[in-house]
Swiss-Prot record:
Homology family: Belongs to the peptidase M17 family.
Record's keyword terms, sorted: Aminopeptidase, Cytoplasm, Hydrolase, Manganese, Metal-binding, Protease
Cofactor: Mn(2+)
Organism: Histophilus somni (strain 129Pt)
GO molecular function terms noted in the UniProt entry: manganese ion binding; metalloaminopeptidase activity
Enzyme active site: K279, R353
Locations listed in the record: Cytoplasm
InterPro entries: Leucine_aapep/pepB (IPR011356), Macro_dom-like (IPR043472), Peptidase_M17_C (IPR000819), Peptidase_M17_leu_NH2_pept (IPR023042), Peptidase_M17_N (IPR008283)
Keyword Repeat: no
Any one of the GO BP annotations: proteolysis
Stored Gene3D superfamilies: Leucine Aminopeptidase, subunit E, domain 1, Zn peptidases
Protein name (Swiss-Prot/TrEMBL): Probable cytosol aminopeptidase
UniProt keyword Manganese, yes or no: yes
Gene: pepA
Residues involved in Mn(2+) 2 binding: K267, D272, D290, E351
């Protein structure tokens, strides 16, 4: 859909108009203008109780005196000074739902007049677009009967004062790029595991080179990884007939060609049955989402290339499968990682860290400015934080602060977990340098502590998205998180 920012006299708009009204008869500035233009029409509707201003109410007006608009959407927003970001999202969703039912093709929105604490018009517009695009998303590639794609709404105009239009246009640019990145991440993550295997993931990575001439892609197969001594990564893949493949996506657009790159590493378990430590059958189908870390890194790289930010960024998609088979690795096995450290396997379902530890060692060759890994790593993180905040662990205070700031800017929320030396005690093994699990307590933290052993040569952060990467129930599907958070982080780094 086309988004734009313009400033047009209310009396001259001949398409469709969206106005905000609040409880207790309060009107937004443009709603006041409309009331004056229509000789008190809106005031009379409030007086007789037709318009309440309560959140969730959307009233459609037609044939209004002194107004050329086809329709006026009067949107109830609740208490003017108590609107939260969550409520703002709900207001946008309800408004779009109503508009689509009318078959309107063009709308002019004044909802950016809604005031939110510590938010500006840039945020209002950007968040509105991301919400609108999310409401349009559907994944029906494998359905014989496709969803309704016949919406006639093709232009959404934000009415913005001239002095704010440059900022509004920048918000539109950012929002559209991020929304595209989120969509691509969702599409890959929602794809079934009989289609989306490590080779498919690598093919998607290679397609990015066609999207942008700033991107080059290298794919490492099992032969190349064996030559690099990535035996921990390869052990996880032993039970699968599908070859493990690690895709390295290089984006280079920094004015200084020698500038150190930012590296993003995504866990790409295209299906995780748990291996010999087999998972319960209930909801095992959702383990196709164990590659959401890689999918989100793909989405970020897509958004990055669309925005052409002046950065050097490398995205790594660490793809493989963890399945039970006569060739599968076993509890009790001792693996030698690429770093040389040995790991005793106590549970084959704690496989993500075994893949990531070698990927995190591999990226040392790029002499990175910093490294962020993204992974659906632990159920313990879901127990600790639920499904609203991603878990953040970091060895660098400044990096942690920057990521939390990006999370706050985008509402792609994250919460920092501790990382102190005591947690390493839980990872001790009688037979190897490390055990791959740390016992029952603090599982999300001990998983991060395990990875920290392989990140000593650069600033590092870890995002555990096990609780935020997908939804369950009637709204089942990938969320595309944390594409928004990480893209905002990169935008901030480029300034």
């Amino acid at each position: 859909m086309k988004y734009s920012a313009k400033n047009t006299a209310l009396s001259q708009i001949d398409s469709n108009i969206i106005l905000a009204v609040f409880e207790d008869g309060e009107l937004s500035p443009t709603a006041m203008q409309f009331d004056q233009l229509s000789q008190g029409y809106l005031t009379r509707l409030i007086q007789v109780g037709e318009v309440s201003g309560k959140q969730g109410q959307v009233l459609i007006l037609r044939d209004i005196p002194n107004c050329q608009a086809q329709r006026i959407f009067i949107v109830g927003c609740g208490k003017k000074d108590k609107i939260t970001e969550r409520q703002y999202k709900q207001i946008i969703q309800k408004t779009i739902q109503t508009i689509l039912e009318t078959q309107a093709s063009e709308v002019v929105s004044f909802l950016n007049e809604i005031e939110l604490k510590n938010r500006d018009i840039h945020w209002n517009i950007r968040f509105a677009i991301e919400t609108i695009e999310a409401s349009f998303y559907q994944f029906d590639a494998f359905k014989t009967k496709k969803g309704d794609e016949n919406s006639v709404l093709n232009e959404f105009i934000f009415d913005v004062q001239p002095e704010l239009q440059q900022d509004a246009l920048l918000a539109i640019t950012y929002a559209q790029a991020i929304a595209l990145g989120v969509k691509h991440a969702k599409d890959i993550a929602n794809c079934p595991p009989n289609i989306c295997n490590p080779t498919y993931l690598a093919e998607q990575a290679q397609s990015l080179a066609k999207h942008s001439n700033l991107i080059n892609v290298q794919v490492l197969g099992e032969k190349e990884m064996a030559e690099l001594n990535m035996f921990s990564y390869l052990a996880v893949s032993q039970g699968s007939a599908n070859e493990a493949k690690m895709s390295v996506i290089e984006y280079r657009n920094h004015p200084d060609k020698n500038a150190k790159p930012i590296v993003l590493v995504g866990k790409g378990l295209t299906f995780d049955a748990g291996g010999i430590s087999l998972k319960p059958a209930d909801s095992m189908d959702e383990m196709k989402y164990d590659m959401c870390g890689a999918a989100s890194v793909f989405g970020v790289m897509y958004a990055l290339a669309t925005l052409q930010l002046p950065l050097n960024v490398i995205g790594v998609l660490a793809g493989c499968e963890n399945l039970p088979d006569g060739n599968s690795y076993r509890p009790g096995d001792i693996l030698t990682t690429m770093s040389g450290l040995t790991v005793e396997v106590l549970n084959t379902d704690a496989e993500g860290r075994l893949v990531l530890c070698d990927a995190l060692t591999y990226v040392e060759r790029f002499n990175p400015e910093l490294v962020i890994d993204v992974a659906t790593l632990t159920g313990a993180c879901v127990v600790a934080l639920g499904q609203h905040n991603s878990g953040l662990i970091a060895t660098d205070e400044k990096l942690a602060e920057k990521l939390l700031n990006a999370a706050e800017e985008t509402t792609d929320k994250a919460w920092r977990l501790p990382l102190s030396e005591e947690y390493q005690e839980q990872l001790k093994s009688n037979f190897a340098d490390l055990a791959n699990i740390g016992g029952r307590w603090g599982g999300a933290i001990t998983a991060g502590a395990f990875l920290a052993n392989f990140t000593k040569n650069y600033p590092w952060a870890h995002l555990d998205i096990a609780g935020t990467a997908w939804l369950q129930g009637t709204n089942k599907g990938a969320t595309g998180r944390p594409v928004s958070l990480l893209t905002q982080f990169l935008i901030n780094q480029s300034k």
